[in-house]
């Protein structure tokens, strides 16, 4: 059986659908190479002295881990000189990073969470890199933050790399979801799962149950029904999973179904959610929808949300379509009664 590398897959998609421009193909390959470098750093862990806090904070007010900083630098260094990008934006940087004038500039914008789930680094649990690609609205002109303010429907590619027992790159360019496993001996990502689909129904949910007392009534209603099991209104037993790493939780859902929820809660009522829209929720929503699932903020499709700022937050409910639609319906019913 012929093994299909990431490069070959992208070239063949370019030939078949003519939707992957050569510059986009090269950009994705550069991101993949950066993910290989990050995977190598993660796998060395304490041997390379990369565990623990960096002693700094990011724009979100979160403590940066050493690997957060390393992963961010790897992605910046790998992508700035290739000529495919006009600018980049990262969870770890307050403002966007425009490609320096000493390098050629391209027609794409890249956004990323360089190391999602970094609180799990020191305990050796799966973490990952999430990325999203947009067209630069005005190629050749000076980049502004407004250029990034595009809804998720404008994404031309989205994906993540999960660093676990295997390193797996999960990608969509708008023609389904495909998974590539890193062959460390060959040094390349190899296609291992094509056209991944999420089942419409599930018996598994992922949410941080310790926050139950802070949830809005629609979320409480949904979880209470799940916990009631066979004797409850759902008539079936549910299992709960929670890794505290969005990449790991979404990867499980893409692999076997389920629903992931990181909802608004009363602890910080002024914030619409915890996760970031532009480089966490949008790329994951694109992947989930391309796999036949759904993704909403409880009120509307995530990819229809119009961004207003780079680090905008959003409530997230995504995964198996029928479950996401049920949770969303509960939110809309609560709105109608209010």
Curated annotation (Swiss-Prot):
It is found in: Cytoplasm. It is an enzyme of class 3 (hydrolase). Binds 2 magnesium ions per subunit. The keyword tRNA-binding does not apply. The keyword Metal-binding applies. Its EC number is 3.1.3.11. Pfam families: FBPase, FBPase_C. It catalyses: beta-D-fructose 1,6-bisphosphate + H2O = beta-D-fructose 6-phosphate + phosphate. Mg(2+) 2 binds at residues 113, 116, 280. Signal peptide: none annotated. One of its GO terms (molecular function) is magnesium ion binding. Substrate binds at residues 116-119, 208, 274. GO terms for biological process: fructose 1,6-bisphosphate metabolic process; fructose 6-phosphate metabolic process; fructose metabolic process; gluconeogenesis; sucrose biosynthetic process. Keywords: Carbohydrate metabolism, Cytoplasm, Hydrolase, Magnesium, Metal-binding. One of its GO terms (cellular component) is cytosol. Mg(2+) 1 binds at residues 91, 113, 115. Its cofactor is Mg(2+). CDD domains: FBPase (cd00354). Pathway: Carbohydrate biosynthesis; gluconeogenesis. Homotetramer. Belongs to the FBPase class 1 family. This is Fructose-1,6-bisphosphatase class 1 1. It comes from Cupriavidus necator (strain ATCC 17699 / DSM 428 / KCTC 22496 / NCIMB 10442 / H16 / Stanier 337) (Ralstonia eutropha).
